[in-house]
Each structure stands twice: as C-alpha cells, then as structure tokens.
C-alpha cells in the first residue's frame, strides 16, 4: 500500500503543474482556430491531459531529487529488460498461489492494467474513433514508454505492454457500457457535439 501511495503522490505535482499550462494553451488554440467551446469536452480533455502528465512522471520522466544545489535528475537506479512474454505474469500468479503474496499482483499486475484504462475510456469519449483506434492508442503509448525506459533508470518488460493493452481494452469496455446507459450524456464530450456554451470573445 505504501508503494501505491508513493506512486500516486509522485504523480500529483506533475498533474498540478500541467493544469495551468494546458488551460493557457487550450484557450489560445480555441481563440486562434475559432473552435466551438464545449464544456464537457474541455473538462474531459483537461482530466485526460492531467492523467497523461501523471503517467509520464512515473514512466518516462527521469526521477528528480532535491539536493544542496537544487533539483537534480537522478540517473542512477535499477534497470531491467525482460523480453519474454508472460514471464512476469506467471511469476505473479506463482507468488499468489504458492507463496500467498499479493504484493506483485496489486502493485505491478493490476497497477499496469488500471493505469491504462483511461486510454480506453477517454479516447473514444473525447474523439469519434473506432474500437481498434482506441486500443491502438493505448498500445502505441505503452510501446513508446517501454522503449524509452531502455534508456532510463527504469524497468522495461514486455508483460507491461501486454497488461497496459489489456487495461486499455477494459477501459474501452467501461466506456461502451456507460454509453449504452447514458448515451446522450457521453456523446456531449465528443468533438462535433453541440456546444454547451459559446466561448466568450
């Protein structure tokens, strides 16, 4: 549990930092491109961008540390590259069944799945995309992260790619389930939906 809290607390500063930047950039783009202002879409996009910033802080942004000379990038650390599919997944299930340890299951196994559910949920929510496009978005982002981690003090594991993609699919299933019940509300978040309010000139 402490490791989960540490990851979440590490995400928050980056999510807070990106918020004003996103708002400023978005306002400029809306003005320059004369876009219709849709509060539903903008709020959804705001949350999605904040999530991406938090995800990046735990995956591709090098760890930072405060020292006497200020903030420094921590380049030292553990590196691991695992390219055998399902190896980590099998180890996780072994730990659960044989050793009755759920640590890897909760933090790494389920964490990798839950962490990518927003891709499967927000991509079709905010843009008119097919199921394949939404799934491919999560897969490509995960692939980019795993390749990037080869050059960072982080771990690269092909099972992460598998679990991340599974999480994207689950997020997509959640979106489709909610849309089947709240179609009118969910469609308001997409580009091209009637503007909820005219953007002030």
Per-region residue spans from a language model:
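Loop-to-transmembrane alpha-helix initiation sites
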Residues: 156-157, 161-162
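Bulky hydrophobic segments
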Residues: 1-155, 173-201
């Amino acid at each position: 549990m402490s490791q989960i809290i540490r990851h979440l607390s590490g995400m928050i500063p980056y999510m807070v930092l990106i918020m004003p930047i996103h708002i400023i950039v978005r306002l400029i783009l809306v003005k320059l491109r004369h876009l219709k202002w849709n509060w539903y879409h903008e709020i959804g996009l705001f949350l999605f961008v904040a999530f991406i910033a938090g995800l990046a802080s735990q995956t591709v942004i090098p760890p930072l540390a405060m020292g006497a000379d200020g903030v420094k990038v921590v380049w030292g650390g553990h590196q691991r590259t695992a390219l055998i599919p399902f190896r980590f997944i099998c180890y996780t299930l072994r730990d659960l069944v044989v050793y009755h340890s759920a640590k890897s299951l909760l933090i790494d196994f389920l964490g990798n799945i839950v962490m990518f559910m927003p891709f499967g949920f927000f991509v079709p929510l905010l843009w008119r995309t097919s199921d394949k496009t939404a799934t491919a978005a999560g897969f490509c982002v995960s692939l980019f992260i795993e390749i990037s981690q080869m050059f960072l003090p982080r771990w690269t594991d092909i099972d992460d790619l598998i679990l991340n993609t599974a999480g994207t699919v689950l997020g997509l299933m959640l979106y489709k389930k909610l849309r089947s019940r709240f179609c009118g509300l969910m469609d308001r978040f997409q580009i091209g939906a009637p503007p909820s309010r005219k953007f002030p000139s």
